[in-house]
Amino acid sequence: MTFDQSNFKSLIRPVIDFPKPGVVFRDITPLFQSPKATRQVIDSFVQRYIEADFSHIGVMDARGFLIGSVVAYQLNKPLVLFRKQGKLPADVLSEAYQTEYGEAYLEVHADSLCEGDSVIMFDDLIATGGTLIAAANLIRRMGAEVHEAVAIIDLPELGGSKRLNDLKIPTFCLTEFALDEQ
């Protein structure tokens, strides 16, 4: 199946001034309304990582769950859930981070990873990189390492991919948008 970049980007809806004035939110829900596009996204990630040497897939709450869980299933890898504060029932590790909207906390079960594990982190989008950096810090606190940070969309003008790369975390995104791109 050929990956059609222009059709793919047309399925990501810009929502102006959401969730606050001045923000252009990239809504991926239309992408999931197209089984063909969803399959192309999943297949692209599966093909990229089918031979890669890593042990776990970490998914960010909540839109990272949509793609990362299917990729984990396809690659037969354990899934690690990184949740918003207060959503996990057992002992957790917590990490504060800044989003483009304000401060938040990311949590993971403290027994999710072991020393020597290697994690591919999935989110829907890289903006400031705050969520993925917080997840990387949690991964490292458990003695594991980050293989790569992955998203459907990169917003390079917000600097997240650069921040991740500066922290020696490679990134991979299927597409990118300029902030003013409609």
UniProtKB/Swiss-Prot annotation:
MF terms in GO: adenine phosphoribosyltransferase activity
Pfam family, one: Pribosyltran
Gene Ontology cellular component annotations, sorted alphabetically: cytosol
Subcellular location field: Cytoplasm
GO biological process: adenine salvage; AMP salvage; purine ribonucleoside salvage
Cysteines engaged in disulfide bonds, as pairs: none
EC number of this enzyme: 2.4.2.7
Catalytic activity: AMP + diphosphate = 5-phospho-alpha-D-ribose 1-diphosphate + adenine
Signal sequence extent: none
Keywords: Cytoplasm, Glycosyltransferase, Purine salvage, Transferase
Pathway involvement of the protein, from the record: Purine metabolism; AMP biosynthesis via salvage pathway; AMP from adenine: step 1/1
Top EC class of this enzyme: transferase
InterPro entries associated with the record: Ade_phspho_trans, Adenine_PRTase, PRibTrfase_dom, PRTase-like
Subunit annotation: Homodimer.
Record's function text: Catalyzes a salvage reaction resulting in the formation of AMP, that is energically less costly than de novo synthesis.
Family the entry assigns: Belongs to the purine/pyrimidine phosphoribosyltransferase family.
HAMAP family reported in the protein's UniProt record: Aden_phosphoribosyltr (MF_00004)
Protein name: Adenine phosphoribosyltransferase
